Curated annotation (Swiss-Prot):
Catalysis performed (reactions): thymidine + phosphate = 2-deoxy-alpha-D-ribose 1-phosphate + thymine
GO cellular component, one term: cytosol
Name used for this protein in its record: Thymidine phosphorylase
Primary enzyme class: transferase
Superkingdom: Bacteria
Length: 443
């Protein structure tokens, strides 16, 4: 038997907690036998004194086990259960292509995603733009679609990781969100509750990333890779670039359109393609579905080119309540804004740098993101044809096209976009889409 205040005192004094102490405290978070003040105090103690890797693994697994842990054995799946998670960015539509692509190569992808908050878009918000799509299906329907289609992308159910829900809301109100130990446990407890065989982790770097510096992003990526592998899930973390919008657009319906164009081959943004392939290939390798990276990429290109990945996206949409002909006729179903108009730079030159966070906030201002949890969204608004760094721009080449519902909203977004995309006389040096892979062998 432990006392919550003694556990707090121990961490306050900079000592390591045992896995039993951590389990006791997390159980108290779940059962409400630990008070909000005690949770806040432990959060602050961890923020200042950190946790070693054993403590992080213990915290992650205790939070994972605080609710239901999914079990796939009874379904008799004939392939690995694999997934990816992103720390979030702007124009990060990867999940919509990656899930069906991995499923088409023999994996099973039970992806539990989130909604957008702040400047980053949420995968669930994109699916909410599709009429009828259930982001909160029954567990029976979720399991059925995973088994029959190979991929289902839904929201977190109430019985998964209840400890994280309570802990996170208290951290949010007490300025302890930025602790890498606590971020690691929060992210991974939700993913590991899906009982995955393998996970590819996408940690963003740059002006639109969650972490402020490359060093902080790398520290988080290393922590996630070490803890996930330590908890028994094969995991690789990729450090990927978010110094510019990843897709050619940012929003909800506009990103769904880009995802379908990518899957059908109508248009594939080269940067988006590179990061999607990098993450998806890693999932296949970790899941034993490919012998090396070249083999993985060949398999992925095959399911893109033969239409199998697009077909599975359509089956997932219809399986979860959306239209059966969505892939073929998406323009009939996706909402469109009143005003669709280009924005031009005030000078000619090259797109030199981008405040990606500000572009994400421009989408929020248009109504496509939340200022606070629970806000209703306008799924039609956003940005399309966003220029890439190094693109030449002039009075006839727009830096973006704004989708807005009113002249006032357009004018506000136009100012924000012009301010966020900096034009230079020369093109900037090209940066890689993927900076680094952090595999178990690198830890």
């Amino acid at each position: 038997m432990f006392l919550a205040q003694e556990i707090i005192r121990k961490k306050r004094n900079g000592l390591a907690l045992s896995s039993e102490e951590i389990q006791f405290f997390v159980q108290g978070i779940t059962t409400n036998s630990v008070s909000e003040g005690q949770i806040a105090a432990l959060g602050m103690a961890v923020y200042f004194n950190d946790m070693n890797m054993d403590e992080r693994i213990a915290l992650t697994t205790a939070m994972r086990d605080s609710g239901t842990v999914l079990n796939w054995q009874s379904l008799g799946l004939n392939g690995p259960v694999i997934d990816k998670h992103s720390t979030g960015g702007v124009g990060d539509v990867i999940s919509l292509m990656l899930g069906p692509m991995a499923a088409a190569c023999g994996g099973y992808v039970p992806m539990i995603s989130g909604r957008g908050l702040g400047h980053t878009g949420g995968t669930l918000d994109k699916f909410d733009a599709i009429p009828g799509y259930q982001t909160e299906p029954s567990s029976e329907l979720f399991r059925k679609v995973v088994k029959d289609v190979g991929v289902a992308i839904i929201g977190q159910t109430g019985d998964l990781v209840p400890a994280d829900k309570r802990f996170y809301s208290i951290r949010d109100n007490t300025a302890t969100v930025e602790s890498i130990s606590l971020i690691t446990a929060s992210i991974l407890s939700k993913k590991l509750a899906c009982n995955l065989d393998a996970l590819a982790m996408d940690v963003k770097v740059g002006s639109g990333a969650f972490m402020p510096t490359y060093e902080a992003s790398e520290e988080l990526a290393r922590s996630i890779a070490a803890v996930a592998n330590g908890a028994g899930t094969k995991t690789t973390a990729l450090l990927t670039d978010m110094n510019q919008v990843l897709a050619s657009c940012a929003g909800n319906a506009v990103e769904v359109k880009e995802a379908i164009d990518f899957l059908t081959g109508a248009y594939r943004n080269p940067r988006l393609y590179e990061v999607t392939m990098g993450l998806c290939a890693e999932m296949l390798l970790l899941g034993g579905l490919a012998s090396n990276e070249a083999d993985a990429r060949a398999k992925l290109n095959r399911v893109l080119d033969n239409g199998r990945a697009a077909e599975l996206f359509g089956k997932m949409v219809s399986g979860l309540g959306g239209p059966v002909d969505f892939v073929e006729n998406y323009s009939k179903y996706l909402p469109q804004s009143q005003i669709i108009r280009p924005v031009f730079a005030d000078m000619q030159g090259y797109a030199y740098s981008m405040d990606t966070r500000e572009l994400g906030l421009a989408v929020v201002t248009l109504g496509g993101g939340r200022r606070k949890p629970g806000d209703a969204l306008d799924y039609s608004v956003g940005l399309t044809q966003v220029c890439a760094l190094g693109d030449k721009v002039d009075s006839s080449t727009p830096i973006a096209v704004i989708h807005a519902q009113s002249e006032a909203a357009f004018a506000e977004a136009e100012l924000a976009v012009k301010k966020a995309i900096h034009i230079g006389e020369t093109a900037p040096e090209k940066t890689p889409e993927i900076y680094a892979y952090i595999r178990a062998s690198d830890l």
